[in-house]
Amino acid sequence: MPQNRWKYPDGSVTIKLYEPFPAGESLLLKLEDKTMDYNKAALEMHETHKGKVGIVSKVEVATRDDLSTAYTPGVAEPCRKIKENPEDVYKYTFKGNMVAVVSNGTAVLGLGDIGPEAGLPVMEGKAVLFKEFGGVDAFPICIDAHDAASVIAACKAIAPTFGGINLEDIKSPECFEIEETLERELDIPVFHDDQHGTAIVVTAALINALRVVNKKMEDVHIVLNGPGAAGTAIIKMLMTAGAKDIIAVDQFGTLYKGCNSAEAHKNWLGEVTNPRQIKGGLKEALEGADVFIGVSKPGILTTELCKTMNKDAIVFAMANPTPEIMPDEAKAGGVRVMATGRSDFPNQVNNVLCFPGLFKGALSVRARDINNEMKLAAAYAIADLITDADRSEENIIPGAFDPRVAEAVANAVAKAARETGVARL
């Protein structure tokens, strides 16, 4: 076996990031060198290894006995056992630790609708992160399906093979129907990371930001700019966490009762948010606000707008690669706590803090679903890793490489699954 392919101590299938650097050196750490040309490095890495993932056998097939045990005739016996008791598929196959990363490539971050083939490198990367950060095996599946019904049918067809499904880079509003239908019709966890992974990490960061400024979730006035898939999930998650005063703002202005949006989810948001029924644009929404959360576009928030916010304002500007406002501009406007989606600024809101541990926890108890209680448990598990002594304006969330994160999230999610009755173990 080549040295850059190895088995994990637990013997699980290895989907491993191959290293084009000398043994023992981490590619991920090398890529943190700011002087490196990421585009050039990525092309070289992908071409050299023909992608980033592969399958490594858990067993050795070196003799006739090995062959007869791993394949015919011996393999017939586990097949018979599973036929007698379908739950034994978890006992005799990789299903219990295998996630499908499913995408149709219609909403790839920063690239848009690029199709399934062009989206494959991203899905390979997601599989790498599942394994590297959570020890969860994941397989990228890019499908040529654009309408919701076709994506749903494809996911249902492959579901018997997998312990969970991670939906990725599927455009709105189709993503809502796809996830809701699969959650209802499948008995394995289905999770759209672009929605809920973002929402969980944002909630974790906000929990700690509010601790820094000594405010409570139920008391603060929150403005969210960009109520698409991620923005809508963030609002739902914050409401689950206790937020009561949220205003959503899209390109046409605030959402309110009777706003008559062309998008159904925005009409729903207009009904359940904006308790004071504020009408207008971002300027009107931000007056006296405690928190701004942006999942929208670069430069939409200005220093002058920040000055209209409440004292000790919190700004999460998560448009990538250029945020809604740069940290120095926000600070000039009186913002006290600032977070972005970028690794070169403090307080990076990064989904990798969530999905590896969340699936690890859900799979460990064979959860049928990932419910709100499990999501909120994940958010608090992430937030609580920052102690009172360490918490500050520039340290409200763990770093992506914090080795404690996945295990803490997994334990919290598994506990919540058992407490809410969706665990089978």
Can you annotate each of these PLM segments?
Residues 3, 8, 14-32:
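Short, positively charged and aromatic/hydrophobic N-terminal segments
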Residues 10, 29-190, 410, 416, ...:
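N-terminal ligand-binding/catalytic initiation module
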Residues 193-194, 213, 317-425:
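Adenosine-phosphate binding glycine-rich loop
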Residues 267-336, 342-344:
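Rossmann-like adenosine-cofactor binding region
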